[in-house]
């Protein structure tokens, strides 16, 4: 039996991974990790929505130490104000790198993969499905093929059962992910990419700020990828 744990953070990438895993595995478990991020409450509600929508069990794990370490580093993703950017600014590598530094949670993907690996090791093995992609890999080193390769090397020594990291989006940008979401029939408008979400609409859609890097990447990817964006924004993203 093929088993997968999907690291689910609520955005386009992990939503695409969830639909993909549901199609490709016999058993799928969603794993959402809380560490005090600004969008945590919204993320949890989004996770609960897709858990019910796809009939996939959900585990939410809280890591207080990661919240403490994030505040120690001063990441804006935990209790801070994230930078506002435009689509044009995203093309400036220096701006993109500075934004990435601002929202960096110390060793987050290493920690999250370790948590998922522990769960799968307890269950007898399986795949950790992650939403790493080419667009974010350009500024986040822990979203690259090299990172996946090194983590899989580590897991050979760190687990008793056979556990590996699988990154189905690793060669896709946001446009490609948008196309995949459409192909899979995903209700992406119920996902959340925003670093500073403004709550929910009456019918349960997250309200995105429209000004943070993640909102701009989301809007640009959907518009250029599938020619539409059903996301609700407080402010229309500038792409």
From Swiss-Prot:
Cystine crosslinks: none
SUPFAM superfamilies to which the protein is assigned, alphabetical: Adenine nucleotide alpha hydrolases-like
CDD domains to which the protein is assigned, alphabetical: QueC-like
Superkingdom of source: Archaea
Cofactor or coenzyme needed: Zn(2+)
Positions of ATP binding: 8-18
Co-factor remark: Binds 1 zinc ion per subunit.
Pathways involved: Purine metabolism; 7-cyano-7-deazaguanine biosynthesis
Assigned keywords, A-Z: ATP-binding, Ligase, Metal-binding, Nucleotide-binding, Zinc
Signal peptide extent: none
Tagged with keyword Nucleotide-binding: yes
Reaction catalyzed: 7-carboxy-7-deazaguanine + NH4(+) + ATP = 7-cyano-7-deazaguanine + ADP + phosphate + H2O + H(+)
Single GO molecular function: ATP binding
Residues spanning the membrane: none
Keyword Nucleotide-binding included in the entry's annotation: yes
EC nos: 6.3.4.20
PANTHER family named among the record's database cross-references: 7-CYANO-7-DEAZAGUANINE SYNTHASE (PTHR42914:SF1)
Known function: Catalyzes the ATP-dependent conversion of 7-carboxy-7-deazaguanine (CDG) to 7-cyano-7-deazaguanine (preQ(0)).
Annotated protein name in UniProt: 7-cyano-7-deazaguanine synthase
Gene that encodes the chain: queC
